[in-house]
Amino acid sequence: MARIAGVNIPTNKRVVIALQYIHGIGPRFAQEITKKVGIPVGRRVCELSDAEVLQIREAIDQGYKVEGDLRREVAVNVKRLMDLGCYRGLRHRRSLPVRGQRTHTNARTRKGPAKAIAGKKK
């Protein structure tokens, strides 16, 4: 199992798919990285040499924010919004949807399980 950016990536999958196991690397960035390093599309992780794994590591370290750094940056951005007291910050603080979705009937993922209200039965 190859270890890239602190993540054990699966050995039996193709490189483009396996790279997507790293937080912050999606399909587009995975393709970009493999193209930059010069790895064919169909190559599997178990077929990679140590030099190729090292090249992938260097390409990721060089140009992409992944894993802990990315999570930290997102958390800092959300905290900044909350400290500013802007509308988006207030929505984050109250654990409500931030991007204008309706909350009267939906938004259960963000709000959590429904709370029972005494005397409210139809």
UniProtKB/Swiss-Prot annotation:
Pfam families (UniProt xref): Ribosomal_S13
InterPro entries: Rbsml_uS13_C (IPR027437), Ribosomal_uS13 (IPR001892), Ribosomal_uS13-like_H2TH (IPR010979), Ribosomal_uS13_bac-type (IPR019980), Ribosomal_uS13_CS (IPR018269)
Stretch list, region Disordered: 97-122
Source organism superkingdom: Bacteria
Keyword check for Ribosomal protein: yes
SUPFAM superfamilies named among the record's database cross-references: S13-like H2TH domain
UniProt key word Isomerase: no
A GO term for molecular function: structural constituent of ribosome
UniProt GO BP: translation
This protein's GO CC annotations: cytosol; small ribosomal subunit
Keywords: Ribonucleoprotein, Ribosomal protein, RNA-binding, rRNA-binding, tRNA-binding
HAMAP family linked to this entry: Ribosomal_uS13
Similarity comment text for this entry: Belongs to the universal ribosomal protein uS13 family.
Subunit structure: Part of the 30S ribosomal subunit. Forms a loose heterodimer with protein S19. Forms two bridges to the 50S subunit in the 70S ribosome.
Function: Located at the top of the head of the 30S subunit, it contacts several helices of the 16S rRNA. In the 70S ribosome it contacts the 23S rRNA (bridge B1a) and protein L5 of the 50S subunit (bridge B1b), connecting the 2 subunits; these bridges are implicated in subunit movement. Contacts the tRNAs in the A and P-sites.
Protein name: Small ribosomal subunit protein uS13
Gene: rpsM
